[in-house]
C-alpha cells in the first residue's frame, strides 16, 4: 500500500498571497502569520513570495484565478475577512468568495488555500487572526505548501 502525505517544507515554492484591504486591521495579522509560516516553517525565500492587495473579499476569486493561471506560482493563498452584519450582504460575499476560490483550484490545478475568515463578530475575527484561536493566515499558508507537495507526489 502506498500512502501520500504532504510536508510543509517547500524551499523552492513560488507562492502568491491575494489579500483583501477591507477589514485590513484584521487582515494585516493574517498576512503576517502567512508570511511568517511560509518563511520560517516552509523555508520559502522572500523573492518567491508575492503579495497582491485587492479591495475586498469579493474580488479575491478573479485575482486568484489570474495568479493561478499565470504559471508563475505553485500555490495561491487567499486572505480576507467577512463579518456578518445586519443584511444579506455577508451570505453573498462569503458564498461567492468561497465557491469562486474552490472553482479556481479545480479549474487550474493550482492549490488555492482558503484563509478568508467568515465570522459573526469582529471579536471572533480578531481571535482567528492571531489571538485566542491561532492565526488562520499561517494555517492557510501551511495548507498551500502541503498541497504543493501532495500534488507533486501524486504526479511523480
From Swiss-Prot:
(2S)-2-hydroxy-3-oxobutyl phosphate binds at residues 86-87, 128. CDD domains: Lumazine_synthase-I. 5-amino-6-(D-ribitylamino)uracil binds at residues 22, 57-59, 81-83, 114. Pathway: Cofactor biosynthesis; riboflavin biosynthesis; riboflavin from 2-hydroxy-3-oxobutyl phosphate and 5-amino-6-(D-ribitylamino)uracil: step 1/2. GO terms for biological process: riboflavin biosynthetic process. Catalyzes the formation of 6,7-dimethyl-8-ribityllumazine by condensation of 5-amino-6-(D-ribitylamino)uracil with 3,4-dihydroxy-2-butanone 4-phosphate. This is the penultimate step in the biosynthesis of riboflavin. This is 6,7-dimethyl-8-ribityllumazine synthase. It comes from Edwardsiella ictaluri (strain 93-146). The gene is ribH.
Amino acid at each position: 500500500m502506498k500512502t501520500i502525505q504532504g510536508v510543509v517544507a517547500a524551499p523552492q515554492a513560488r507562492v502568491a498571497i491575494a489579500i483583501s484591504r477591507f477589514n485590513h486591521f484584521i487582515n494585516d495579522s493574517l498576512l503576517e502569520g502567512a508570511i511568517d509560516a511560509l518563511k520560517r516553517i516552509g523555508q520559502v525565500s522572500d523573492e518567491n513570495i508575492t503579495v497582491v492587495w485587492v479591495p475586498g473579499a469579493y474580488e479575491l476569486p478573479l485575482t486568484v484565478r489570474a495568479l493561478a493561471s499565470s504559471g508563475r506560482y505553485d500555490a495561491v493563498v487567499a486572505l480576507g475577512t467577512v463579518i456578518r452584519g445586519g443584511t444579506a450582504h455577508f451570505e453573498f460575499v462569503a458564498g461567492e468568495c468561497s465557491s469562486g476560490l474552490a472553482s479556481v483550484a479545480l479549474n487550474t490545478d493550482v492549490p488555492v488555500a482558503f484563509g478568508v475568515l467568515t465570522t459573526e463578530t469582529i471579536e471572533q475575527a480578531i481571535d482567528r487572526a492571531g489571538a485566542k484561536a491561532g492565526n488562520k493566515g499561517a494555517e492557510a499558508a501551511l495548507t498551500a505548501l502541503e498541497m504543493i507537495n501532495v500534488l507533486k507526489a501524486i504526479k511523480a
